[in-house]
Regions:
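Bacterial Sec-dependent N-terminal signal peptides
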Residues: 1-37, 739, 746, 751, ...
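Exposed, low-structure sequence patches enriched in small/polar residues
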Residues: 226, 260-310, 314, 318, ...
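Low-complexity, intrinsically disordered/propeptide-like segments
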Residues: 4, 21-29, 326, 342, ...
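A generic structural signal for short coil/turn motifs at secondary-structure boundaries
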Residues: 25, 164, 196-200, 522-524, ...
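Membrane-proximal, glycine/serine-rich, low-complexity loop/turn segments characteristic
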Residues: 33-277, 281-348, 352-357, 361-366, ...
Length: 785
């Protein structure tokens, strides 16, 4: 026990020291800077940031970027920057609150922030088996965090709510970001989701605190991320009988929504997750004069205009002062002063007539003002003639890159009671892990990855059309698993070493691409290979352009650690003999803005696919023999995906559609619905020219299939194995009616979700029904101040 306490204390101490060092990396260069004139914040050439590279127009057509606000994300290998759009769009704001996704593309257990899995199988991650994977609605991965650079501090408050204190949902987000100077900025985000649940034993309480900082200097760049998540999900195992939803008239008793019997009670999943990222680089290069960006030219023109107006105002004020002195109209009586030594009756020789004096001084003042105005106009003309708009810029040629990522996770599954004969197996575990008949399955792990790279950057010379990087990476991971009552628990350490390279082209308007390769040379993952490539081509057609996006990868990977080893009271496996799984993916998408059409095609091929299977018996709503285990298919499995997006507008009427077709060669191993459909019909107009309104209804639908079932004890979705109790879901439309508003920087909505409830099979996961008809409201307010 002492050793265990000592280990926990040491881990906390290391985390504090680690966090302090990361903050120091950011603070030292930031404190060395002064507060100079602030422009767009991207005056330094960086081959990884391409402001000319357009985002998908169909995805960003509703986004209006505030002036002076720039956002970007970083990748997990090198910290390369990619422009990002701010989350300020009115369009589909009301759907951002759903765990099922904006377009209903996720299967979920039903509650706010509850476990979910992508129904479009090509979008899943098949290499991970973490306990937080199913909570992707709430957890923001480091590669999706938006860094900010703004002319003024940014504050955003978002809140949505439904129901009451017994069964409602509340979600609060608060974000703040500010720049210290033109190079350095930081921000933080607080996120709290509390879903009490409309069914028994279903509540979720999710907390996230994330802070970040960035420093973009001429030679040194750094990005820092810290995040901590505390996640608690109450597990009910689903309802005992689906007929309470599908055929309530066939049951012997009638239940309200919160009275429907569920399988489990007093069962919880609890996870604490800490993440830290430090991505920094030192650039070596030279200075040269380059054209300013449109934003910089606009800022420079604004500064020149302000200076001219100031000088003109000063000249006018000086001329008016001289004119007033000449005419004697000073606006206030002057106090007469008596000069000592001058006799009272003394006279000035040669006094001029007062009218002549006023005329002469007035003429002189007007001539002076005219000369000053002519001078200002000459400056204006010279500025207008100067169209070069150049600046001196530091151009990096070579970058020395270091990227550090640290994750520490603690996961516990707790059960105070379980149904009789519910589990098929029972294993011997440490006494402090499970007392008597209760369950206290503990698993924790940490992962530390260091990547060192040298990059030759594109853009410093016209004869170098691309950038290139080479890197080495080391990864150390420690997994803590339960053992028998004598050994108690074990720590399993895995070290891996890999090398790789990248070719990248982000500059220009026609062609962009990025190819990354990595090979593992030592450790448990020796022999693993990952090759990822993506690119886009812009082709002009009929005074418009078509954007063709291409993506492909080849992954030969060792199964994740928890797919190979897992120990708990009722689930236990050690699969050292699993083969490497091969995943090949080819994807292409085409977007034509003129017709508002988008097409997507994807092909996936799996060999030795590793997956989780679940099996049990069900008799008169009683479940027995519940078990789950890792399986590997020796088959060659193919998955074909075709998606179509088409939008229409007729006056104030808008109609948006997304259709996805999927076909898998073996639905017993990789089950997918053949058809997914989302449609949105709404009126778009303004009230009093200031209040933008979207009023309409949307619907999500998918064809019935044997969907993966949720296994709460493992926080994973699993393929249904027992043909006698296999359950289909789908073939049911879910319709929402909404009114979505935008008033300046304030977005708000009112909605009646699932207006057609009570009419059928409303499950998005087997045995986990969706909420019935619910009135919802939400608000998001952004302040730049």
């Amino acid at each position: 026990m002492c050793a265990e306490v000592y280990e926990v204390k040491m881990k906390k101490t290391y985390s504090i020291i680690f966090a302090s060092l990361l903050l120091l990396f950011l603070a030292i260069p930031a404190m060395a800077q002064d507060n100079t004139f602030y422009d767009d914040g991207f005056s330094v050439t960086d081959n990884t940031f391409n402001p000319n590279r357009a985002l998908d127009s169909l995805k960003t057509k509703h986004v209006k970027v505030p002036k002076g606000l720039y956002l970007w994300t970083i990748d997990d290998h090198f910290g390369d920057r990619t422009t990002a759009a701010p989350d300020t769009a009115q369009h589909l704001f009301m759907n951002s609150i759903f765990t099922t996704g904006r377009y209903g593309e996720y299967n979920t257990t039903g509650n706010l922030g509850a476990p979910r899995i992508a129904r479009i199988a090509t979008d899943r991650d098949y290499t991970s088996f973490g306990f937080t994977d199913v909570l992707s609605y709430f957890i923001t991965p480091p590669t999706a965090l938006r860094f900010t650079n703004a002319l003024s501090p940014i504050t955003n408050l978002s809140f949505n709510s439904c129901g009451d204190r017994t069964n409602g949902e509340d979600h609060l987000k608060a974000l703040f970001a500010v720049n210290i100077n033109r190079e350095a900025g930081f921000g933080f985000k607080f996120d709290y989701a509390y879903g009490r649940g409309y069914y028994q034993n279903q509540s979720t309480a999710l907390f996230d605190y994330t802070m970040w900082g960035s420093y973009i200097g001429q030679r040194y760049n750094a990005h820092v991320i810290f995040s901590f998540d505390h996640l608690k999900v109450t597990e009910n195992g689903g309802i005992t009988n689906d007929e309470y939803i599908t055929h309530p008239e066939a049951t012997s008793e009638t239940y309200s929504e919160n009275e429907i019997p569920v399988v489990l009670s007093s069962n919880w999943n609890r996870t604490n997750a800490f993440h830290a990222t430090l991505a920094h680089r030192y650039n070596v290069g030279f200075y040269r004069k380059v054209p300013m960006t449109e934003q910089e030219i606009e800022a420079r023109r604004f500064a020149i205009k302000a200076q001219k107006e100031k000088e003109a105002a000063e000249a006018a004020a000086e001329a008016e002062k001289m004119l007033a002195g000449a005419t004697g109209n000073t606006g206030a009586p002057k106090q007469s002063k008596r000069l000592s030594g001058r006799p009272d009756d003394a006279m000035i020789v040669g006094d001029l007539n007062n009218d002549s004096l006023r005329t002469a001084l007035k003429k002189a003042a007007e001539e002076r003002r005219k000369l000053l105005m002519d001078s200002l106009m000459a400056k204006k003309d010279s500025v207008a003639i100067d169209t070069s708009w150049t600046k001196e810029e530091y151009v990096p040629v070579t970058s020395f890159i270091h990227n550090l990522q640290f994750d520490d996770n603690w996961h516990t599954y707790i059960a105070y009671q379980s149904p009789t004969n519910f589990y098929q197996n029972k294993y011997s575990v440490p006494v402090d892990f499970a007392r008597r008949d209760s369950i206290n399955d503990k698993t924790d792990y940490f992962n530390l990855r260091n990547t060192f790279a040298i990059g030759l950057l594109e853009g410093f010379n016209k004869y170098v059309p691309m950038g290139a990087k080479v890197f080495i990476a080391h990864n150390i991971a420690n997994y803590r698993l339960a053992e028998d009552s004598l050994t108690r628990y074990s720590n399993n350490v895995e070290n891996t070493f890999s090398v790789g390279g990248q070719l990248i082209k982000t500059l220009g308007n026609t062609l962009h691409y990025k190819v990354l390769g990595e090979v593992w040379l030592a450790g448990k993952q020796v022999g693993d290979v990952k090759i990822d490539g993506e690119g886009d081509i812009r082709v002009p057609i009929l005074k418009d352009s078509v954007v063709l996006n291409l993506k492909a990868f080849y992954h030969l990977t060792t199964p994740a650690y928890f797919q190979r080893h897992y120990h708990s009271k009722h689930f236990w496996w050690d699969h050292d003999g699993l083969n490497k799984q091969m995943h090949t993916h080819v994807e292409g998408s085409l977007a034509y803005t003129k017709t508002r059409t988008s097409l997507r095609f994807a092909y996936d091929n799996f060999q030795n696919l590793v997956y989780l299977g679940v099996s049990y018996d069900r008799n008169n709503s009683v479940i027995t023999g519940y078990t789950a285990d890792i399986m590997q298919s020796s088959k060659n499995i193919s998955l074909l995906t075709l998606a179509i997006q088409q939008d229409f507008t007729l006056g104030i009427l808008n109609w948006e559609n997304r259709i996805t077709f999927q076909k898998c060669s073996d639905n017993n191993i990789l089950p997918v619905p053949d058809f997914n459909f989302w449609t949105n019909l709404y009126l778009k107009f303004k009230i009093a020219r200031v209040l933008a309104v979207h009023f309409g209804a949307d619907m999500r639908y998918f064809k019935s299939y044997y969907a993966p079932e949720y296994v709460p004890q493992l926080s994973q979705f699993a393929v249904q194995q027992n043909d006698n109790v296999k359950t289909k879901i789908g073939n049911y439309p879910v319709i929402d009616v909404y009114a979505n508003f935008l008033l300046k920087r304030c977005r708000f909505f009112v909605m009646m979700s699932h207006v057609n409830s009570g009419t059928g099979n409303y499950f998005f996961t087997p045995h986990y029904p969706l909420n019935q008809r619910v009135f919802r409201l939400g608000l998001s307010w952004t302040v730049f101040n």
